[in-house]
């Protein structure tokens, strides 16, 4: 996943792929994502009635958005499996991607982001602690929400937006950077410091997908990261 490899493959990758959906479709997806950010801001202040309804709302919204992307892909005759890429014809292929995912979470999610977070003095708002699960039902729903995000957000950002922006700019690198920025903006309710870290993390996920020509390792990494982050935070708070 060296930078030289990414640069050398830049024009080659984008020359073989056109836009994956109409421009109006992408504009509408971007508009809907603003709702995710608004919902996130709302969730920070909702605790009295429990978190389960809000987790379910996020799960539903993400699947609806992926369904809309699937609709847009269909208008261009692009199967969802082409956007996801890769395959698991045998267990060895799955465990290979799982190993890559674990290494990515530990090295990039752990070492790099923690280092940058320390330099930026980026800390989550206290209200965000209320987003983490407290009860058994909430923990189960958190896991479901985490793996929903692992699949859906990788399809949305590293699949759909990355391919779309790369086609428009004729550059895979630009596609990776732009989708990372949108990923950060979708988490804008966390403050500009954390938003910047999330945008950078999104770009790292984009490079991983570009390197592997598949969203699968990123999906596994994303699901693992979100699951572990929420459950660990829940136990550390008690």
PLM feature spans:
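Hydrophobic alpha-helical transmembrane segments
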Residues: 27, 55-56, 94-99, 139-143, ...
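Functionally important transmembrane alpha-helices
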Residues: 35, 190-238
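Membrane-interface helix caps and helix-loop-helix hairpins in membrane proteins
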Residues: 47-49, 185-193
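Juxtamembrane helix-loop-helix connectors linking adjacent transmembrane helices
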Residues: 45-55, 80-149, 167
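N-terminal, membrane-interfacial amphipathic/helix-forming hydrophobic leader that caps
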Residues: 1-92, 118, 230-238
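Small-polar-interrupted transmembrane alpha-helices in polytopic inner-membrane proteins
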Residues: 172-187, 202, 223
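Aromatic-anchored segments of alpha-helical transmembrane domains
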Residues: 32-42, 105-111, 180-188, 226-232
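Membrane-interface helix/loop boundary segments of multi-pass membrane proteins
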Residues: 152-178, 207-214
């Amino acid at each position: 996943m060296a930078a030289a490899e990414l640069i050398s493959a830049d024009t080659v990758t984008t020359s073989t792929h056109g836009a994956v959906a109409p421009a109006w479709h992408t504009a509408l997806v971007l508009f809907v994502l603003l709702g995710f950010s608004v919902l996130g801001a709302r969730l920070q202040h909702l605790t009295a009635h429990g978190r389960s309804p809000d987790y379910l709302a996020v799960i539903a919204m993400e699947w609806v958005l992926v369904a809309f992307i699937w609709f847009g892909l269909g208008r261009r005759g692009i199967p969802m499996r082409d956007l996801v890429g890769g395959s698991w014809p045998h267990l060895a292929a799955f465990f290979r991607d799982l190993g890559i995912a674990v290494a990515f979470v530990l090295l990039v999610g752990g070492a790099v982001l923690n280092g940058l977070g320390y330099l930026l003095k980026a800390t989550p708002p206290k209200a965000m602690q209320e987003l983490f699960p407290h009860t058994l039902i909430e923990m189960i729903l958190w896991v479901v929400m985490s793996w929903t995000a692992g699949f859906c957000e990788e399809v949305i950002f590293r699949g759909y937006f990355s391919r779309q922006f790369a086609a428009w700019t004729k550059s895979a690198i630009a596609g990776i950077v732009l989708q990372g920025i949108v990923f950060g903006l979708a988490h804008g309710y966390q403050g500009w410091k954390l938003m910047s870290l999330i945008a950078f993390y999104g770009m790292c996920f984009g490079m991983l997908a570009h390197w592997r020509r598949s969203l699968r390792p990123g999906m596994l990494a994303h699901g693992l990261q979100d699951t572990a982050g929420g459950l660990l935070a829940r136990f550390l708070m008690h």
